Amino acid sequence: MSGKAGTFIIGGVVGILGIAMVFGGEAAVSQTEFCISCHSEIYPYEELKKSSHWGALGADPGCKDCHVPQGFKNFHKAIYTHVVDGVPFLIKEFTTDYSTVEKFNEHRPEAAFRARMKLKEWDSLTCRACHKNVKAPGASAKAAHAKMQSEGATCIDCHQNLVHKKVPEHDLNASLAQGKPVAKVEKKKKDDDEEGSKD
């Protein structure tokens, strides 16, 4: 009996320590300091500090606030993000020359696309964590938000290039459907093209 009880206690302690390590490890790798310990992540971090998201209402968001789902109910998404998405980035950090911002910029469109697709997959969960009960200002914004809801769009479909250096925007619904990056067509250009095709 005492052998079984001892095994049970040891198993319980090991289990609790394991859970603590998983939660503690996740918390550690979600810190901005951890993210920017890779040389290439310094560039986006400096851009964040110059963006409208930095300092607004006293908030200084970290990398995780946009790029890692937070909270207990999203813990599995945070783990997935660090393991499945983060490990390839870590490997790329060692196999790609990011020694200058110009070299980093060569890879920026690919990184932006992947980040946008993650936000799309999460229904802009990380945006909504801070921007709750958004009230669109003005008639055009209200119309755009109504259209967003009816067409299955989410925050990131329209709100791209808000924080980091601008790169070409993507049509995320088309990208999902085609399984590859699809550039967003400017509305005016699209309308002009349609007019030209009627002639």
Label each region the model flagged.
Residues 1-199:
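Short sequence/structural segments immediately N-terminal
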